[in-house]
Design a protein with these regions (language model features):
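Short amphipathic alpha-helix adjacent to the substrate-entry channel of hydrolases
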Residues: 65-82
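Short, mixed charged/polar active-site loops
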Residues: 35-39
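Flexible "cap/lid" subdomain of the alpha/beta-hydrolase fold that forms the substrate-access gate
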Residues: 2-24, 40-48, 53, 60, ...
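Short acidic-hydrophobic surface loop/beta-edge motif
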Residues: 23-33
Length: 182
């Protein structure tokens, strides 16, 4: 039984203005041992940066490429910059089973990512769904976080439901023939 799909690297050969080395981390999905080889892709630039570590978490339907204009500016300010591809996006593996698509699973993946890379002095840069996820991270280990920038994010609070228009937008992204094969 196939649990996920891996996008061939040739799909990214014509990407412009994104000449950063791609790294992969695995063994950070807790829902089943069957996902032990599931890979999360990320770029990690200026690893010796002295100003802190910017961790960029994108939203729908984009990937780490979203941060291509921010990365050189942050490097110039001597930040280490990590831009990851959430599961299902960019160079990360694409889950195929519904069991994977739980908020708490994505959240745990992000926490393990931070832990495995031993990140500290983190400044989160959060976009859309990345903001919804990322805003829950500092409460787990506040000492490693130094700040955050959040834009175009849905702030879930368990009191109000997600709007139907937002759900329709997400559904359109998931069901779009143009996005299915990415």
């Amino acid at each position: 039984m196939t649990l996920y799909k891996r996008t061939d690297e040739s799909c990214f050969k014509d990407i412009k203005n994104f000449d950063y080395m791609c790294h992969f981390i695995s063994n950070i999905v807790d829902i089943s041992d069957k996902y032990s080889d599931f890979r999360i892709a990320y770029v990690d630039e200026n690893t010796k940066g002295k100003s802190g570590t910017i961790v960029c978490i994108h939203g729908h339907p984009t990937w780490s490429y979203l941060w291509r204009h921010l990365i050189p500016i942050a490097i110039k300010a001597d930040f280490r910059v990590i831009a990851l591809d959430l599961p299902g996006f960019g160079r990360s593996d694409k889950p195929l089973k519904e069991e994977f698509f739980e908020f708490n699973n994505y959240r745990k993946i992000l926490l393990k990512f931070i832990d495995k890379l031993k990140l500290e002095n983190i400044f989160l840069f959060l976009h859309e769904w990345g903001g919804t996820l990322g805003l829950t991270l500092p409460m787990e280990n506040a000492r490693v976080f130094s700040g955050l920038v959040c834009f175009s994010a849905y702030m879930g609070n368990n009191i109000t439901s997600v709007s139907q228009s937002y759900l329709n937008w997400i559904s359109t992204n998931i069901e779009s023939d143009e996005l299915k094969d990415l």
